[in-house]
A protein has these predicted regions:
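Extended amphipathic alpha-helical segments with heptad-repeat/coiled-coil character used for oligomerization
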Residues: 184, 188, 197-265
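General "foldedness" signal
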Residues: 144, 217, 224, 228, ...
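Ser/Thr/Asn(+Pro)-rich, low-complexity disordered segments
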Residues: 1-125, 137, 148-159, 251-383
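Intrinsically disordered, low-complexity regions enriched in Ser/Pro/Gly/Gln/His and often acidic
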Residues: 32, 167, 239-241
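Eukaryote-skewed repeat-based solenoidal scaffolds used as protein-protein interaction platforms
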Residues: 65, 84-180, 184, 188-215, ...
């Protein structure tokens, strides 16, 4: 299928051509969230070559050191629990799993598994990983982690509550082409790796929500309309979420290629979705084509970032035959001191596709009114 072709293209790049050097750019102190850059290589290597692949098996052992293994939070734990649940019989999983689990379980500061703080996508990564770690602890090491069943129940409750809130209020990081893959990776891991059928169902519901959000706004490799927490993405298939959109729905105006030895982390992060058994519903795939919603206006609203003040943010999104235009209005001020990461409106115009070239993009015009680096903007510029 076309999806399998796109998925394999991403897997091949990350397994074979994505820059890998376990002693350099990928070390555990710079950046501290080394899992963001390393774990996709493990996933791709196991997915393409099997669980005995030497390259894939070197990473868990390499990072099982006192200084590295302490960094058990968001980007790190979500990738490793994806690996543990998908490739349980890999030699490096068998030899390292208890060390990683113990380090994560025993962390008690504000980056701990069960009550950690952070952004919305940080919590999504950490809590989904906490559930899977609790499942592993309960099933494989019950004597070492006697409270595993209690923690598993607590995390199930959190997952259920958060999913219900998603469908009630929407996310705080709505339509974010920067953080989409980080918001869904843990739910992909649950969809494939949770043993509780209720948890798998709720993971499916969360993934369907995000897939529908992408499908509605996606045009020729670009996330259209308003975005919460984004600071780039003005060309087709260059941003994190746009690679997920391309994987799920295709429709790129250009040829997608990957340079051997490059560090395209935006593409590499999509390997979790490429390796998962999750597929968007056919209704969502059809929505992405826009065929049945031409010349339609979509209205919605969102709460503020912490989901308080429901409906405060008003959104409109128009789907024309050759373009989309979306805007969001935030009726509160306080845009001072730094990057608000709100992209308040965006126009995306279609172009004639040419898959023989690699440098073509849909036309994009972006409203910077609510997104400026280190400049106070006050309220919205059209107030």
């Amino acid at each position: 299928s076309e999806f399998k072709y796109r998925a394999q293209k991403i897997i091949n790049y990350v397994a074979d051509d994505y820059k890998w050097d376990a002693s350099g750019w990928y070390n555990c102190n710079n950046p501290s969230d080394y899992g963001k850059y390393n774990w996709p290589i493990v996933v791709a290597s196991f997915q393409k070559y099997g669980i005995n692949n030497p390259k894939g098996n070197q990473y868990l052992t390499h990072f099982n050191t006192e200084s590295c293994i302490y960094n058990r939070f968001h980007f790190n734990v979500v990738g490793e629990t994806y690996i543990f649940t998908h490739y349980w019989d890999a030699p490096s999983v068998k030899s390292n799993i208890k060390d990683y689990l113990t380090a994560a379980w025993n962390r008690t500061d504000s980056y701990n598994l069960f009550t950690s703080e952070g952004t919305e996508n940080h919590l999504a990564m950490t809590r989904t990983a906490a559930y899977l770690y609790a499942q592993i602890a309960k099933d494989s090491f019950p004597n070492d982690f006697p409270n595993a069943a209690q923690k598993l129940a607590e995390m199930k409750s959190w997952l259920m509550d958060w999913a219900a809130m998603l469908y009630t209020s929407g996310p705080g990081e709505w339509n974010s082409s920067t953080y989409l893959p980080f918001s869904i990776t843990g739910w992909l891991a649950l969809y494939d790796g949770a043993k509780d059928p209720d948890v798998r169902l709720v993971a499916r519901a969360v993934l369907d929500y995000y897939a529908a959000e992408v499908a509605l706004h996606y045009t020729q490799g670009i996330t259209g309309g308003y975005e919460s927490r984004n600071s780039s993405g003005y060309e087709s298939v260059v941003n994190y979420g746009d690679y997920v959109g391309w994987l799920w729905f295709g429709e790129s105006p250009k040829k997608i290629t990957f340079t051997p030895g490059s560090q395209n982390n935006e593409a590499a992060t999509a390997v979790y979705a490429a390796s998962s058994t999750y597929r968007p519903p056919m209704a969502v795939v059809k929505l992405a084509s826009k065929a049945d919603i031409l010349n339609s206006m979509y209205y919605n609203s969102k709460g503020e970032y912490l989901l308080n003040n429901p409906g405060a943010i008003k959104q409109t999104f128009y789907v024309g035959k050759t373009f989309t235009l979306g805007a969001a209005y935030l009726p509160y001020g306080g845009f001072t001191g730094g990057d608000t990461q709100f992209q308040m409106w965006k126009f995306v115009g279609k172009v004639a596709p040419d898959t023989t070239i690699t440098a073509k993009t849909a036309n994009v015009i972006v409203g910077y009114g609510g997104k400026e680096w280190n400049k106070a903007r006050g309220r919205m510029p059209w107030d």
